[in-house]
Amino acid sequence: MKVDVLLGLQWGDEGKGKVVDVLTPKYDVVARFQGGPNAGHTLEFEGQKYVLRSIPSGIFQGNKVNIIGNGVVLDPALFKAEAEALEASGHPLKERLHISKKAHLILPTHRILDAAYEAAKGDAKVGTTGKGIGPTYTDKVSRNGVRVGDILHNFEQKYAAAKARHEQILKSLNYEYDLTELEKAWLEGIEYLKQFHFVDSEHEINNLLKDGKSVLCEGAQGTMLDIDFGSYPFVTSSNTVCAGACTGLGVAPNRIGEVYGIFKAYCTRVGAGPFPSELFDETGDKIGALGHEFGAVTGRKRRCGWIDLVALKYSVMVNGVTKLIMMKSD
């Protein structure tokens, strides 16, 4: 068996959630491979709308295995709120959601660092969501991160060391902050996380494939926000392209099957960065109004413009897209 990958071909917000909603019934497993709570997938199930930040979209299908892979960064406080809201609406997930031990944790100080770094940039701001994504991936790459699996071993010591490092940086930036409420909610989230099944996602997914199970890998954001292939430095901090499914889940490249590339009939972008086809007139405003172009997580108004076929061709190339799906053509 091979894994299929679903991803965005523009700057995110292409309508991936709706496509996932249609595709998930044919898969046994749905796995998130990158990103964090900075992006939301909007889905409709049984007449009710949901916005998922970290939890895979297969959670609404009662018989699916859902996996949060090692490439994801997880905020325990936001995860707890998201999971409890799902459970309250009749979607239990403790038995059906598996979390990679290798996924990195977003600490309260990561969120404060995110705000401090953005403030220090002045006019050169990237326009982050302030969820601590960048600082968390920075710690991951510099080998200073705290992972989900660390919750089970010497957690207090590892957390204290990371927190102390961050506080030194914040001191050097002369950034004022209050950690009390953030840390309280975060520690409650850590206790909540302990109820879930922690796995080595690379082994789990490959074993499921050996057993003949079908797997859909779910990406967040879009190709033009990829840390390597996007409009750097106005990008996210993870690999949003198809190859990210390999590194974010532990799947070999020759295991990739179909690659679903999602794009809109026009383009949108949130935050700063180049946008060649952007519209600054009433046409752009009308597209935004008719398309309800506001961020699912941030609520920020999206910049709107004509479809960029040059950028779309590039995204198809770097992802090896096998199936193109156009959204909002109506």
What name fits each language-model region?
Residues 1-330:
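Non-transmembrane, aqueous-exposed alpha-helical and coiled segments at domain scale
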